[in-house]
Swiss-Prot record:
Name of the encoding gene: PDHA1
Lineage: Eukaryota, Metazoa, Chordata, Craniata, Vertebrata
Class of enzymatic activity (EC top level): oxidoreductase
Alphabetic keyword roster: Carbohydrate metabolism, Glucose metabolism, Magnesium, Metal-binding, Mitochondrion, Oxidoreductase, Phosphoprotein, Pyruvate, Thiamine pyrophosphate, Tricarboxylic acid cycle
Subunit structure comment from the entry: Heterotetramer of two PDHA1 and two PDHB subunits. The heterotetramer interacts with DLAT, and is part of the multimeric pyruvate dehydrogenase complex that contains multiple copies of pyruvate dehydrogenase (E1), dihydrolipoamide acetyltransferase (DLAT, E2) and lipoamide dehydrogenase (DLD, E3). These subunits are bound to an inner core composed of about 48 DLAT and 12 PDHX molecules.
Subcellular location: Mitochondrion matrix
Enzyme Commission (EC) number: 1.2.4.1
Protein name: Pyruvate dehydrogenase E1 component subunit alpha, somatic form
GO molecular function terms noted in the UniProt entry: metal ion binding; pyruvate dehydrogenase (acetyl-transferring) activity
Any one biological process term the GO annotation gives: tricarboxylic acid cycle
Activity regulation as described: Pyruvate dehydrogenase activity is inhibited by phosphorylation of PDHA1; it is reactivated by dephosphorylation.
Biological source species: Canis lupus familiaris
Post-translational changes noted in the entry: Phosphorylation by PDK family kinases inactivates the enzyme; it is reactivated by dephosphorylation.
Length: 13
């Protein structure tokens, strides 16, 4: 996807 922040947040969880 184009949402890099979403991927980072998911990993942060």
């Amino acid at each position: 996807x184009x949402d890099a922040t979403f991927e980072i947040k998911k990993x942060d969880l």
